[in-house]
Amino acid sequence: MRDIKLSNPTTILQVENLQVSFINHGHETKAVDNVSFNIHKGESVGIVGESGSGKSVTALSIMNLLKSPPAHINSGNIFLKSKVFGNVDTLTLSDHSLRSIRGNEIAMIFQEPMTSLNPVFKCGNQVLEALKVHMHMSAEEAKNKTLQLFEEVKLPKPEKIFNAYPHEISGGQKQRVMIAMAMSCNPSILIADEPTTALDVTVQANILRLMEGLRENHDTALIFISHDLGVIAEVADRILVMYEGKIVEEGNV
């Protein structure tokens, strides 16, 4: 695997000329059009734009989670400063190699906490599994770490939440469990795709404060996706504005 030079020593993610399209009934729709940007260690970058502007498709491309077909990455590179592989283009990695990066080096929090957790497993077991797989912890070590994470994300009565099924806790608590899961392996990059949209305003503010605190404490880079400039302004150092699949504006907050 050839070594790749990133544009800056602090750069941990470099997206270059990314083009993604969807093919449906023979018709091609371009969702991401020649997008390029860098993410630096520990910084918070907001990606803002209206629905359909390509924000989530860009995020899913970074995670290599787009289903093909109908999605197709036409061109571009996504370079990651990986703990395991060195500087690598994630689009060239096998599914097996990607499994060691997802959750471990790049983690993602999705918009809808109600559907992000598996309803048939207890909340604690869902976090615990990630620790056993990626951090090679014993069951006891993973449980203790999970309870510690639940405390860190300010879940009340961590032991009770650990043994609860997702339907037994509130939407805000579900999202805190998802944040604990995402942060469990101390990833270099956390992608949050509209993580507060499904929550009420008070819970939304608490989740934003929590994520900002975790980012600073863990020195994790945050990519925060939203259609709401007010929310982005709360957490981002820098903003990328997307429109019709392109980055049309970029600036500091």
What are these regions (language model features)?
Residues 232-234:
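A short, surface-exposed alpha-helical micro-motif characterized by mixed small hydrophobic
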Residues 205-219:
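Helical segment within the ABC ATPase nucleotide-binding domain
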Residues 184-188:
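A short, proline-enriched helix->beta-strand linker immediately N-terminal to the Walker B motif
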Residues 79, 141-160:
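Conserved ABC ATPase "signature" region
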Residues 250-251:
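ABC ATPase "signature
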Residues 77-100, 138, 209:
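ABC ATPase NBD Q-loop/coupling interface
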